[in-house]
């Protein structure tokens, strides 16, 4: 019996060991292949990506998706990823020749796969054991054919639905009793899907184990862990769990109130579960080893448009917002600003005398090291040009890395390298400043 216990402990240690060497922390770096085909300054090609790899233990390339007809794992952009096109799958895994310690994983889903909310293919696949077989076989084939070291499961479960704002902020938050949106039923078959996902993880790991492939889980923003993941049942078949603990608040989820997107700790009069610490404690409290838990850090900010009724202080939560702020000049995504786009809007010699939409935002730091930074510009007399953005910068990312060390967690997942300042434009010299600061603190 003692010999069996010793063997079990050794196997568990080896499973964690393939993610990182003893005593080290994981630093998983996400690379969205779509950034390869962007235009202008937001285009991230492999030559520009390479300076980041000296800091990364893993490169997570995304994103693959599910073909709903065949239930197979497929490229979401064959002309980009496969050999008939740009062959980015092989180019990315080929980076291991230059960086032999780097593990390269393929990510599935990640909120980048098109899903019909009325017929979610990620749920229908789970509902049939026969549907899981082609997914598992195709996943193994893709990983093996293109030289990946494993698979990152960014399974696109239904998300928590925030309540509509009616009246005061306090009344708004008081209505939250559960993380999955109070009155709204996120998934009527949640228990069935939880059991089936447990089976999928077990079957995938069994298929991967002979080749030593890594299997990781990414808990996507606003997916209810208690609803969809049987932590004790899946954790031994997972090499890591990335908690994507950001985007708790976004202008798409709540267009009338601007608030911190990714606080470390609970804020007053907020849902107590919308913070990094709660999500970490949920998993470790359900028997997930701390060494398998990685905290996700977004390299971008979430931006709301402010109105004259939003006030002048910028102190969150800011009421009477008006949805997404205009898109940035590089990423061209309304309501989202990459770190270099945020940096360019903070006070600097180039914008200090500008007015209107080009005027600088007022930066407000976080001396408590608990909630994050934000910057804002109040609306003008005509009700225009008001912006509020909550964001991650190198300093706040470093604070989260310190939290990870303090809590004895596995590491950090940086999402996404293409939204970090990979050209060094903010300081004029330092490339990937968020990634570098995280690495310096781990």
Swiss-Prot record:
PANTHER family: CHITINASE, CHITINASE-LIKE PROTEIN IDGF1-RELATED. The keyword Nucleotide-binding does not apply. One of its GO terms (molecular function) is imaginal disc growth factor receptor binding. It is found in: Secreted. The gene is Idgf4. Residues 25-442 form the GH18 domain. Primarily expressed in yolk cells and fat body. In larvae, it is expressed in the imaginal ring, the salivary duct, large salivary gland cells and weakly expressed in imaginal disks. More strongly expressed than Idgf1 and Idgf3. This is Chitinase-like protein Idgf4. It comes from the Eukaryota. It comes from Drosophila melanogaster (Fruit fly). Glycans are attached at residue 224. GO terms for cellular component: extracellular region. GO terms for biological process: carbohydrate metabolic process; chitin catabolic process; chitin-based cuticle development; ecdysis, chitin-based cuticle; imaginal disc development; wound healing.
